[in-house]
Amino acid sequence: MLTKFETKSNRVKGLSFHPRRPWILASLHSGVIQMWDYRMGTLLDRFDEHDGPVRGVHFHATQPLFVSGGDDYKIKVWNYKTHRCLFTLHGHLDYIRTVQFHHEYPWIVSASDDQTIRIWNWQSRTCVAVLTGHNHYVMCASFHPKEDLVVSASLDQTVRVWDIGALRKKTVSPADDILRLTQMNTDLFGGVDAVVKYVLEGHDRGVNWASFHPTLPLIVSGADDRQVKLWRMNDTKAWEVDTLRGHMNNVSCVMFHAKQDIIVSNSEDKSIRIWDATKRTGIQTFRREHDRFWILSAHPEMNLLAAGHDSGMIVFKLERERPAFSVSGDTVFYVKDRFLRFFEFTTQKEVQLAPIRRPGSVSLNQSPKTLSYSPTENAVLICSDVDGGSYELYIVPKDSAGRADYLQDAKKGAGGSAVFVARNRFAVLEKSSNQVLVKNLKNEIVKKSPLPIATDAIYYAGTGNLLCKAEDRVTIFDLQQRLILGELQAPSVKYVVWSSDMESVALLSKHAVVIANKKLVHRCTLHETIRVKSGAWDENGVFIYTTLNHIKYCLPNGDSGIIKTLDVPIYITRVIGNNIFCLDRDGKNKLVTVDASEYIFKLALLRKRYDHVMSMIKNSQLCGQAVISYLQQKGFPEVALHFVKDEKTRFNLALESGNIQIAVASAKEIDDKDHWYRLGIEALRQGNVGIVEYAYQRTKNFERLAFLYLITGYMDKVGFMCKIAGQNNNLMGQFHNALYLGDALKRVEILENAGQLPLAYITATTHGLTEIADRLAAELGENIPSLPEGKARSLLIPPAPLTASGDWPLLRVMHGIFEGGLDATGKAELEEDDEAAGADWGDEDLDMVDASEAMANGGDGFDAEEGEANEEDGEEGGWDLEDLELPPEAETPKNAGNARSAVFVAPPPGMPVSLIWTQKSSLAGEHAAAGNFDTAMRLLSRQLGIKNFAPLKPLFVDLHMGSHSYLRALATAPIIPIAVEKGWSESASPNVRGPPALVFTFPQMEDRLKAAYKATTDGKFPEALRQFLSILHTIPLIVVDSRREVDEVKELIEIVREYVLGLRMELKRKELRDDVNRQQELAAYFTNCKLQRVHMRLVLGSAMGLCYKQKNFATAEHFARMLLENNPNEAQARRARQVQQQCSGKKDSSELNYDYRNPFVVCGATYVPIYRGQKDVSCPYCGSRFVPSIEGQLCTICELAVVGADASGLLCSPTQSR
């Protein structure tokens, strides 16, 4: 059983498939009818007008109707498009068990517990026949698919077949029937239009279900005696053929399969059983743990069944319908009707090659599952689930094409899956041992190879390679070298599709498509809500795949879309241009022609083949919101512009692409305040002053307009704005403009007119306007405000705009491939005079006038050519400015900037100093100073094997910042970085560049070393360790001038390494409080480090005292002797001699891992001695030694390099590379 869909609900008592749509009706014991889309797995609708359980439900074959019958004695006919019940049929006197539409006539047959069967005309909404004769509940009734018969089953232990031929004749030619019974008589005694033809007796208990065979004169029935009986009938009689036994409880429902010779039954024993209708034997049984089955339904066209049970229903198939096929070159090989066939794509010729052996068993799902073809040997491998998984090898002679009688003995073998891996070799998966067997064409094992992962299936992955599928991932396995060539996380892969060049692979699972390259490096993943069925690569590298109801595409970057909607699932075999070759579920080759222009267009954009894009824009009918949205998302709004006619969309795209001209044209058409506002913002961002001015004029945003005039230096226009504000009685606007102008007299006048005499007096007095101040003082009388004494006065005037000009100069850029010529109107609007305009964007030929002139003409519209009447004149008389003496008409933005701006030509860029620094340098410090951190890291990795760059990050930043100086310029200009060179002088040639001046130098390292020595002497071990490590981390980035200094740097590394090792051991020793032996060993190893003599004396004294305390007298005596050899001071010498005397001739109380007689070095990670002659590995940078097991790990001394890594060596001077 292949479950396609499952629901959880109350007990399902009735089921019905829609004949064409992927819908199923389920009627529940709770009284609800559900309509599901079983393909998408969604609940489409629910209908709940019945009172009590609904036991019968059925779709009409052609109309948007379904019928239902329930325990409320009602039959309801529904229209699922309008979601309502059309009418209710009354007549039954007890529960209604089943209802069914006639396939041709407007009839409904219903079976009821009132012991009758009724036939209704749903068009006239009347009962046309009552079939009486059963003497117990009638459990089901159904029409014959072709003849005028009805079959019914009843708890009176009989199955009855009724002849309704007379009813049909009366319906076809309704004549006045003088003997026609009244409706009451029909209800009581039944009509004469339907008579019993056969009564089938044989069941020992009540019969629950009976149904006709779709084509043969057979009936199948199931009863409470747990038996399924098969009956045959002819024109005169009917008889029992056989009895199928196996159910353990009442048989609820039974029916013939529409396309196969099988019978399907279900029962209250919680099982569904499949029977062979010809051999009358059980084939398969499917069980549920807790749910009894009540109803079955078969799809009239497709190979689908549904079963209702106590907690829902399931939609399932009995067998896979996917044909086994393999594409090779221009041919597809496939299996159909137990024959191996091939189909040529170019000639579209289908040829039958050879018959395929039928499986011996009668169980389901024995058809071929996969097929693999070897073109050189003309051999075919067919795998199936026969005998738990097996394969058959056919070698087809060249001359056998078309000979259906040709039959050969296939070479067989057991195996989960089998594929060809070479010309005459194939691989077979042996699941039990998780190994692959390589066999020749004689079916002999040539080689066995264990697989690297627990493999469920194998697929071809190139000659000699297998793609192994596990539950959660796939790997490519080289059979010859037994190596994994690639691995990818991809759960539950079902199919693998390689491109023709074997460079790309698509991994298809139930609801996902994963695209990867030939080494299984992930490219993209697509997730689908419904099942993915098949796929193939087209010649452009686009993957075309199918789901249950769509053909879709996937571009190399993961973008996808729908090409075509499907009615039935198909399996793609080949894609050639606009033609998709495929197989359907019946194994027929089909050709589907599609429009590939959408994905070809997107692919050309992705690959930047703009000539193709331009050609497609001009010649094809690409349109629609999806293409526009895609272009916008991918950063091509200028291309999307040429598809758009809607002005609002054009405006948005024009702003996004920075195309001010089209934005202005669209804003004029829309003429909406919000769009002018947005246009102003974009024009301001581009520095296009003329357009900004025009946008502010259209929105009457006079405050912004006045400020724009101020910052661009048009002070005369600020004066006009002041007059306009005065005419509008806008005191604040008037005062702001007077402030912008620095006109104190005007400000006094405005304040006086506003009645603010004290403020006017203060302003006049402050600015030295004594006459006006005296006049105002006389008016104020005693209310004269007092001015603060001793404070200096200052003139309130805005600074003069230094960069006052028209439009900002913009760098000239290359025209995009899409600019110009794509549509006639766009070309006319966008035509430019390049020579005249240069980079000054103030030259657009726009219909604009000055704000003052616009005010004079009515104030609403600023477009003089539009000639529009002022729509707001009647309401806003305060805008009337006719009496003003205004200057001549302001210039449009075309000439807005020409008075002060000239053609701007950007200077050619030179080579950055940082690039000069790194061109011929192999020194990591200089690359870091130039800001090329990635190349610096690569150099350090190659030279010193450094892998951990975290400690070097702040040093890189310090080097880069320290080798540059930064110069602030104007507020509108960016900060200018200046490279600081080593040995720079004014007399140097500008074409000769020196190396960068580095902040880290070798003398600095010597100063740090002295500080670290002092911290060590003072016993500040953590601080000393930090300082030594800072030296070790900085050394790779310093640069010295001579070979002698290079040697000194290398010597410094050795010194620091010894101290870091010793200090780490000492800090480790102090952490160990309980392990006294390990404490003594670490103290002893510290004495083996090469230290300064002053520090060596301290270390020896510490080790001597520790060993003496723990009664290791021999070792303590050794340390005392070494201390005396290192010129100790008087106190140290006295102490050493005392220990020597006490320990003379005594032995150690415990054995230490320390032999001072045998030369050794200490492992920097494990702190154990590595004696001479033992194997070790070293750090490529600091030279620390380690036991071999540490190889490949990070060095614990320098914390930078990888132990045992290959490296060329320290490079810290230009002299080393000469």
From Swiss-Prot:
Alphabetical keyword list: Cytoplasm, Cytoplasmic vesicle, ER-Golgi transport, Golgi apparatus, Membrane, Protein transport, Repeat, Transport, WD repeat
A single cellular component GO annotation: Golgi membrane
Subcellular location: Cytoplasm; Golgi apparatus membrane; Cytoplasmic vesicle, COPI-coated vesicle membrane
Membrane topology: Peripheral membrane protein
GO MF entries: structural molecule activity
A GO BP annotation: retrograde vesicle-mediated transport, Golgi to endoplasmic reticulum
Extent of the WD repeats: 7-48, 49-88, 91-132, 133-172, 202-241, 246-285, 288-326, 363-404, 450-489
Annotated Acidic residues bias: 862-882
PROSITE patterns registered for this protein in UniProt: WD_REPEATS_1, WD_REPEATS_2, WD_REPEATS_REGION
Main location: cytoplasm
Entry-linked SUPFAM superfamilies: DPP6 N-terminal domain-like, WD40 repeat-like
Pfam family name, one: B-prop_COPA_B_2nd
Source domain of life: Eukaryota
Region of interest: Disordered: 857-882
Subunit structure: Oligomeric complex that consists of at least the alpha, beta, beta', gamma, delta, epsilon and zeta subunits.
Function: The coatomer is a cytosolic protein complex that binds to dilysine motifs and reversibly associates with Golgi non-clathrin-coated vesicles, which further mediate biosynthetic protein transport from the ER, via the Golgi up to the trans Golgi network. Coatomer complex is required for budding from Golgi membranes, and is essential for the retrograde Golgi-to-ER transport of dilysine-tagged proteins.
Name of the featured protein: Coatomer subunit alpha-1
Organism field: Oryza sativa subsp. japonica
